[in-house]
Regions:
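Active-site-flanking beta-strand signature of metal-NTP-handling nucleotidyl enzymes
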Residues: 3-8
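Generic structural motif
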Residues: 11-13, 58, 95-96
Length: 104
C-alpha cells in the first residue's frame, strides 16, 4: 500500500471556505476516479489542512492521478480550491508494518 500525506497551509481566514469548496469539488472528483481519502485533520492554530490519500501500488497511483488530472472539473479545483492554498507539502510514503490492534 502507498499513501500520500498532503499538508496545505491555507490562506489566513480561508479555512472554512477551503473546507467547503474541497468537499463540494475535490472530494467528489477523488471518488469519481477511485482515490480513497483515508483521513483528514485541521490544525487551525497553524492554518493547516492535512489529509491522506491511499493507493494500492505505484501503477495504481499513476493511473488514478492521471485520470484525476484529466477530469473536466480540474478548472474548478484551480479556481475554487487551489487559490486558497498558500503552501503545499506532499509526501509519498509506503507502509512499514501493520497497525497495532486496539488495546482495551
Amino acid at each position: 500500500m502507498l499513501a500520500q500525506i498532503r499538508t496545505y497551509t491555507i490562506n489566513r481566514g480561508e479555512m472554512d471556505n477551503f473546507l467547503k469548496e474541497l468537499q463540494a469539488v475535490a472530494i467528489p472528483m477523488h471518488e469519481k476516479v477511485g482515490i480513497p481519502i483515508v483521513a483528514s485533520w485541521v490544525d487551525r492554530g497553524q492554518n493547516e489542512f492535512i489529509w491522506v490519500r491511499r493507493f494500492e501500488d505505484q501503477a495504481d497511483r499513476e493511473q488514478k492521478l492521471n485520470a484525476f488530472r484529466e477530469l473536466p472539473e480540474m478548472a474548478d479545483i484551480r479556481s475554487r480550491v487551489a487559490v486558497k492554498i498558500a503552501k503545499m507539502e506532499i509526501h509519498d510514503v509506503e507502509g512499514a508494518f501493520a497497525p497495532s490492534p486496539a488495546r482495551g
